[in-house]
Amino acid sequence: MASGADSKGDDLSTAILKQKNRPNRLIVDEAINEDNSVVSLSQPKMDELQLFRGDTVLLKGKKRREAVCIVLSDDTCSDEKIRMNRVVRNNLRVRLGDVISIQPCPDVKYGKRIHVLPIDDTVEGITGNLFEVYLKPYFLEAYRPIRKGDIFLVRGGMRAVEFKVVETDPSPYCIVAPDTVIHCEGEPIKREDEEESLNEVGYDDIGGCRKQLAQIKEMVELPLRHPALFKAIGVKPPRGILLYGPPGTGKTLIARAVANETGAFFFLINGPEIMSKLAGESESNLRKAFEEAEKNAPAIIFIDELDAIAPKREKTHGEVERRIVSQLLTLMDGLKQRAHVIVMAATNRPNSIDPALRRFGRFDREVDIGIPDATGRLEILQIHTKNMKLADDVDLEQVANETHGHVGADLAALCSEAALQAIRKKMDLIDLEDETIDAEVMNSLAVTMDDFRWALSQSNPSALRETVVEVPQVTWEDIGGLEDVKRELQELVQYPVEHPDKFLKFGMTPSKGVLFYGPPGCGKTLLAKAIANECQANFISIKGPELLTMWFGESEANVREIFDKARQAAPCVLFFDELDSIAKARGGNIGDGGGAADRVINQILTEMDGMSTKKNVFIIGATNRPDIIDPAILRPGRLDQLIYIPLPDEKSRVAILKANLRKSPVAKDVDLEFLAKMTNGFSGADLTEICQRACKLAIRESIESEIRRERERQTNPSAMEVEEDDPVPEIRRDHFEEAMRFARRSVSDNDIRKYEMFAQTLQQSRGFGSFRFPSGNQGGAGPSQGSGGGTGGNVYTEDNDDDLYG
């Protein structure tokens, strides 16, 4: 242990991950010799390990599995590899490329008797004596070593049968000599039972939380395997571990894997199950669980959903819960000093657990199993797809990069959804009535990248199921004009997500918020949607008035929850539409219930400041009344970029008209540029309305002409064969002319003047067009904005004072 720990003072968790340099650790390779009892090494390796041909060796694999084999030398095998066939690999629960350890095992006795049973699906339809046809030729004169629990495959009589070693005497391993008695009576073993033990979770099946897993290994495996270590140092090993994190990150899975890999007795307590209506029974259920575990030490007790049985005592009204919490506390304290029982618990609400449980000596280690990052997601996807048939075009890295905020459970769902989609495509080739499916169809099944794309469009991160997070279907093409605004937005949201290294290089944290303001109908909401879509971030849209509720304190809690969710699903864009409804200037709201609106603003302010820099959460606010918004929200560091989205100019109007009509058939002679020239002062929404009205008129005409044609057919059936062309193939000029008769401006000149005044005031209070550092060439022109006078520095301080107290 020391060799790993003292290298540059690494902490234990990484030390355990590093494999020590041991010569008896070898990499598993495919066997050339197909014998079930033979493994082969290179001659130099055998010399190093002091082994001879024909020696019996003990191999240790994953999940505490062992096997006993005969070792032979093989010149084609490289020094660090060991060749073994599939049967041995399955018994050791390892795959090609895994690492196993090998050690000499000289004292294997000859067996007196062994008991083997066949596995049911391999012996179906076999008549005759299993022993004579299979077992006798397999063991005769071979002196094979076997171990209890091994499964071996015997070929003979046209087919292969699998047997499992149920019992050996002496146990747990022996050599089958000519005078060993072989029993094979009894019911065949069911394949399902075997599969279950094969599919037990191990550490390999957990992805995306390496660091946490290393921490847990250190806390669980060390005390269970080497209690002497702690004795030598003179401390007690940790007793309890609390795993917490959002649902679906793999807390229960980790506990199962730990139990399987350590070989400890695993006792699962599901929180709600131990509750009972009879007084005293729930507590005795708990006591029984702990007694059972102590009898079978070393043991792991795993309490799932701890918050169900140990809520805060002052908050619960039921007497039963209080008694259970007290019982759990006394049991955790009363675990005998050296009884190797470790209590693990999982919850996704650590703050609702009684604080007495979270002190040292009870659940003294808390491990946060968070949402995995892109590398973690890739690990998880590789684990879930290792048994899937993937087409060559599947790029799991790409999928991992696009699934922001997904936890392990979501990724598992994603993989199965993609596989189902692959099957759906082949559904027309599959006849459900048939007993079997063609081998051709089976072989052609493969999951392609398109299936993953489809599954991605269907799946949401589970943390955000209730606040519907849609990645909107709006792209930059849908937005006409506003080029500068688009560029600024891309810099704000896409750079921190796509180029975090640049921010590190220049030592800056990216800015977090933007406020759009401008007249209604200019595309503020549309911009927010497009940015969320372009950078593949999650998008939570919050309508201002929805946050306010009638209950005291609940509105603030809503704000808190939304920010928590956004942090969980980072990178995430939080879009506050109609910000003025919830962020009015404080103090002026007379008649609002108990100052609820003020408290909501305070909560939003603190959340914006407290957003940890690690997470990419961006806030976009939109309003058309910027003058009534609380100035504290508009300071740099919160919504630091104020972007005025003006009415579109002529060029933008053409772009908007084109964007609106890009899917519609429009006649060649419709001059959109002229239309744009005539619609001065129209907002984007007004222009969209003109296009819609023109479409509507074209549709109306088309339907009317169809009805007319139908009537003509009925009156004159003989003329039916004549194929007429479409009377209204496209939207014509007269449709637009008619639509323009009803067009109106939704924003008056007066309103625009107000917005422009506001924009100008902001510019004046913030900009210094003439600021230059003093150097050889001083100056520049006079101040373009700002009231000027004196040096740039003076203006700056005065202006700042002005801004602060103004």
UniProtKB/Swiss-Prot annotation:
The modification N6-acetyllysine is found at residues 502, 505, 668, 754. There is a cross-link at residues 8, 18 (Glycyl lysine isopeptide (Lys-Gly) (interchain with G-Cter in SUMO2)). The modification N6,N6,N6-trimethyllysine is found at residue 315. Residues 797-806 are annotated as: Interaction with UBXN6. The keyword Signal does not apply. It is found in: Cytoplasm, Cytosol; Endoplasmic reticulum; Nucleus; Cytoplasm, Stress granule. The modification Phosphotyrosine is found at residue 805. The modification Phosphothreonine is found at residue 436. One of its GO terms (molecular function) is protein domain specific binding. GO terms for cellular component: ATPase complex; ciliary basal body; cytoplasm; cytoplasmic stress granule; cytosol; Derlin-1 retrotranslocation complex; endoplasmic reticulum; endoplasmic reticulum membrane. Residues 708-727, 768-806 are annotated as: Disordered. GO terms for biological process: aggresome assembly; ATP metabolic process; autophagosome maturation; autophagy; cellular response to arsenite ion; cellular response to heat; cellular response to misfolded protein; cytoplasm protein quality control. Its EC number is 3.6.4.6. Phosphorylated by tyrosine kinases in response to T-cell antigen receptor activation. Phosphorylated in mitotic cells. Residues 777-793 have a biased composition (Gly residues). Its main location: cytoplasm. The modification Phosphoserine is found at residues 3, 7, 13, 37, 462, 702, 770, 775, 787. ATP 1 binds at residues 247-253, 348, 384. Transmembrane segments: none annotated. Keywords: Acetylation, ATP-binding, Autophagy, Cytoplasm, DNA damage, DNA repair, Endoplasmic reticulum, Hydrolase, Isopeptide bond, Lipid-binding, Methylation, Nucleotide-binding, Nucleus, Phosphoprotein, Transport, Ubl conjugation. Necessary for the fragmentation of Golgi stacks during mitosis and for their reassembly after mitosis. Involved in the formation of the transitional endoplasmic reticulum (tER). The transfer of membranes from the endoplasmic reticulum to the Golgi apparatus occurs via 50-70 nm transition vesicles which derive from part-rough, part-smooth transitional elements of the endoplasmic reticulum (tER). Vesicle budding from the tER is an ATP-dependent process. Homohexamer. Forms a ring-shaped particle of 12.5 nm diameter, that displays 6-fold radial symmetry. Interacts with NSFL1C-like protein p37; the complex has membrane fusion activity and is required for Golgi and endoplasmic reticulum biogenesis. Interacts with RHBDD1 (via C-terminal domain). Interacts with SELENOS and SYVN1, as well as with DERL1 (via SHP-box motif), DERL2 and DERL3; which probably transfer misfolded proteins from the ER to VCP. Interacts with SVIP and DERL1. The PIM (PUB-interaction motif) motif mediates interaction with the PUB domain of RNF31. Belongs to the AAA ATPase family. This is Transitional endoplasmic reticulum ATPase. The lineage of its organism: Eukaryota, Metazoa, Chordata, Craniata, Vertebrata.
